[in-house]
Amino acid sequence: MERPWGAADGLSRWPHGLGLLLLLQLLPPSTLSQDRLDAPPPPAAPLPRWSGPIGVSWGLRAAAAGGAFPRGGRWRRSAPGEDEECGRVRDFVAKLANNTHQHVFDDLRGSVSLSWVGDSTGVILVLTTFHVPLVIMTFGQSKLYRSEDYGKNFKDITDLINNTFIRTEFGMAIGPENSGKVVLTAEVSGGSRGGRIFRSSDFAKNFVQTDLPFHPLTQMMYSPQNSDYLLALSTENGLWVSKNFGGKWEEIHKAVCLAKWGSDNTIFFTTYANGSCKADLGALELWRTSDLGKSFKTIGVKIYSFGLGGRFLFASVMADKDTTRRIHVSTDQGDTWSMAQLPSVGQEQFYSILAANDDMVFMHVDEPGDTGFGTIFTSDDRGIVYSKSLDRHLYTTTGGETDFTNVTSLRGVYITSVLSEDNSIQTMITFDQGGRWTHLRKPENSECDATAKNKNECSLHIHASYSISQKLNVPMAPLSEPNAVGIVIAHGSVGDAISVMVPDVYISDDGGYSWTKMLEGPHYYTILDSGGIIVAIEHSSRPINVIKFSTDEGQCWQTYTFTRDPIYFTGLASEPGARSMNISIWGFTESFLTSQWVSYTIDFKDILERNCEEKDYTIWLAHSTDPEDYEDGCILGYKEQFLRLRKSSVCQNGRDYVVTKQPSICLCSLEDFLCDFGYYRPENDSKCVEQPELKGHDLEFCLYGREEHLTTNGYRKIPGDKCQGGVNPVREVKDLKKKCTSNFLSPEKQNSKSNSVPIILAIVGLMLVTVVAGVLIVKKYVCGGRFLVHRYSVLQQHAEANGVDGVDALDTASHTNKSGYHDDSDEDLLE
């Protein structure tokens, strides 16, 4: 079973450029296929995906009465009697009415997929699909629509794809950046020799039909460096490459399980030798080509899975003598490997890369057994030495759900959930990239719920992916945007743990340090104009016709009735990046026998009439908790002052808005250091103390083929930390001048064959002469002759006894490959 990428979805990647994909389901499962395609997140700044109700029942329902159109209202989220300040957005009803655009789609289709083509182009593609599985065959029909004004108007361009049925499981493959490229994968008859695609390189103004020499298994993968280069896997496990945007294809290798683009148009892939990907799992070979298939190099064997994150290449490798796996890391595209200092995992465990950038890696290591939790480790800047960051991290094995979230609106901030000893779920937050985790502060305008033992002391707990997977009344995951500094919006409950009661919506304007209840009950929400506007729609099973918006980061709210005839709401869509002023509301209307898709696009440009000026911004110190402290705001070695829009200013940031910040370096303190391997921080203490089980044990590890010895008093600098001077704990890595090998078997060693008998005899003679000296050296430097692997295994046993357990969950299938070969719920999630 393929497990999705962790909610870290945090420092993750989206090689296909901008494109938010919505799949809106209309008919029940008995009538329609339930295919759903979720677009993967973009690099380093994951964008939220709409997650709305699916399988809406078909039948006769009375629409709620609409009132006069249009109309509006306002209220303040704080105490009663303060509503006067909310009247500053004047004449907003008339302004929005003049900028509300309705489009009725003249056909009934089972699902709708929506994607943006390019950044700030205004081009949107909408694919409607009607899919009915019959006894002998499947009947399907598609329509394609295009808008070039952010969804205000649509044109039917189905004729450009020859009225062909498009396979929704492959989605719309959008090219990176502003390449304007689009690839649609068509359905073909069962007896066809290959698949069919439709290609556009002019933002979907025109399409070219191309018949493929293979049947695709995955969505076409664009090279991040050159959008003309495409990669695809076939249903027969062939690896195909196109150098001219899909015009011609060449099979460069057979028996391929997984393939990924690396940097500089490099391709990494795993291949099998004994029949199938599943049969050879754990015995796969990892190959690399840097010239699009002209030449190859085997860079790893005994591979279980591999993945890419930041500048790191990861491989989950089977051990020599048992069925355990270990993570190996390379920073030179597989030329040399080092074993990560992480616990090995067994067949029922997994590793998962939660987040990775060029500085560090967050790695989840699964606990043995189906516990549903594991341990988060954070790496050094080489991805080799890891420190324990968080125990009992929630990561289910059944559905692969984790709440790990990168708060992109403030550096160093991550939110996730832990499974406590009493099996309740609690939210934790870190502001220093995993150095220390704490509970979220209780919102000032909220009371503790029934889960709280002390009604005066409790915390805010955030609903994320796990709550959504459990079908709680949570329509959206937490939302933050890099250009809306400090803003975080999320559903939550206030108590001792996450509650199953109906959640409310909370907002933080300082990156998660403090929170305020923003809206009663569950809502859909989105950010426009870099935080200048927040839009929300109530989550309801009844038809709706009202939206809410705020121009002061959720303090005051206005309501606007966008239609007199309520619609069954299915999705709220805005252009990725939060720079747009447009929002699209998707839904359908129902009568006795008919139903129609409808969209309403609202442009807020006239609400924010003027451009923001210097006076509209104020200086804000990020991570500020104690203004009296000289080091206030120091996180990861430096402070940052931002120019932020005043809440009282009603003006446009604009599409060209750039976040203005001023960094300043801080003196080093213990807060700038993680606990080294074998050390931990007691609760509410900044000092690292040695784990009792590891006292007296040396740490030696194999780095780039040489054995090294680590001397430490318990601290290592957080990767990316920029502090200077101040505290400087001793940490030394000493080269033992000894060659070493890890359990990652060198392919050259396995495959090498000698043709020269004299050379062999000479080498043997030399070895006999030097063997005594070698034994003496080993005894002198390796404590009585214990080899590195044994030495590490001893530390491993102590670490596991102390609860430092690991998993190898490297993602072995891309998010677009929902029909991959893996059905193992314990596969490694390396991306």
UniProtKB/Swiss-Prot annotation:
Gene3D superfamilies: 2.10.70.80, 3.30.60.270, YVTN repeat-like/Quinoprotein amine dehydrogenase. Changing residue 783 to S: Loss of palmitoylation. Decreased recycling from endosomes to the Golgi apparatus. Increased lysosomal degradation. Keywords: Cell membrane, Cleavage on pair of basic residues, Developmental protein, Differentiation, Disulfide bond, Endocytosis, Endoplasmic reticulum, Endosome, Glycoprotein, Golgi apparatus, Lipoprotein, Lysosome, Membrane, Nucleus, Osteogenesis, Palmitate, Phosphoprotein, Receptor, Repeat, Signal, Transmembrane, Transmembrane helix, Transport. It is a single-pass type I membrane protein. The keyword Glycosyltransferase does not apply. SUPFAM superfamilies: Oligoxyloglucan reducing end-specific cellobiohydrolase (SSF110296). The N-terminal propeptide is cleaved by furin and possibly other homologous proteases. Expressed in brain and prostate (at protein level). Expressed at high levels in brain, spinal cord, heart, skeletal muscle, thyroid, placenta and testis. Expressed at lower levels in lymphoid organs, kidney, colon and liver. A motif (Endocytosis signal) lies at residues 787-792. Glycans are attached at residues 98, 162, 274, 406, 582, 684. One of its GO terms (molecular function) is nerve growth factor binding. A lipid is attached at residue 783 (S-palmitoyl cysteine). The keyword Signal applies. GO terms for cellular component: cell surface; cerebellar climbing fiber to Purkinje cell synapse; clathrin-coated pit; clathrin-coated vesicle; cytoplasmic vesicle; cytosol; early endosome; endoplasmic reticulum membrane. Residues 1-33 form the signal peptide. Residues 78-755 are extracellular. Changing residue 795 to A: Reduces endocytosis and Golgi to endosome sorting. Belongs to the VPS10-related sortilin family. SORT1 subfamily. Functions as a sorting receptor in the Golgi compartment and as a clearance receptor on the cell surface. Required for protein transport from the Golgi apparatus to the lysosomes by a pathway that is independent of the mannose-6-phosphate receptor (M6PR). Lysosomal proteins bind specifically to the receptor in the Golgi apparatus and the resulting receptor-ligand complex is transported to an acidic prelysosomal compartment where the low pH mediates the dissociation of the complex. This is Sortilin. It comes from Homo sapiens. The gene is SORT1.
